[in-house]
Amino acid sequence: GRSMHWIRIERFWEGEYPEVKMTPQQPMLCQQCGHATCEPVCPAFATVHSTAEQLNLQVYNRCVGTRYCANNCPYQVRAFNWRDYKRPEPLPNQLNPDVTVRRMGVMEKCTFCIQRIHKAQDKAKSEGREVADGEFTTACAQACPANAIVFGRVDNPESLVSQLAHKGHGVKHLEELGTLPNVTYFKGG
């Protein structure tokens, strides 16, 4: 059967035959592009860009399932929801109330846990302050046992992700396409 993944482990190869070797595997998720090729092809305007958060978002209740966005994504990170996930009572109570339940026939993707971002922004606003670095993180970063995923604002010089970015050695996948990806991959060490 089909299963839904918003992040996958991608294998890459380097070298020329017969001396080809596999490079370290990397997670591949929505790159939250500044010039996302998936946005202009959506006839229902379900794929939108949030300039405030600098994210590429999916408005699920607008999506009509044409899959044009998936065809236009060079990272192949969008997934079509082939199933209607109905659960018998009381199992629906286990669902995260902060995440929209999507219906069959819509496109899905990583949103960098926008619901967590908004929750932290609302809390900071009610307390009359800015959102602190590390105040929230994405679910994948929280669940990663190796702490290999770091989330934050690269435009905040105090943030850990900004400090990592300024050390250099970062790689952005398919940057040459002009999509302005916002995910940077760093070598471990």
Where are the language model's segments positioned?
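Non-ligating segments of multi-cofactor redox enzymes
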Residues: 1-189
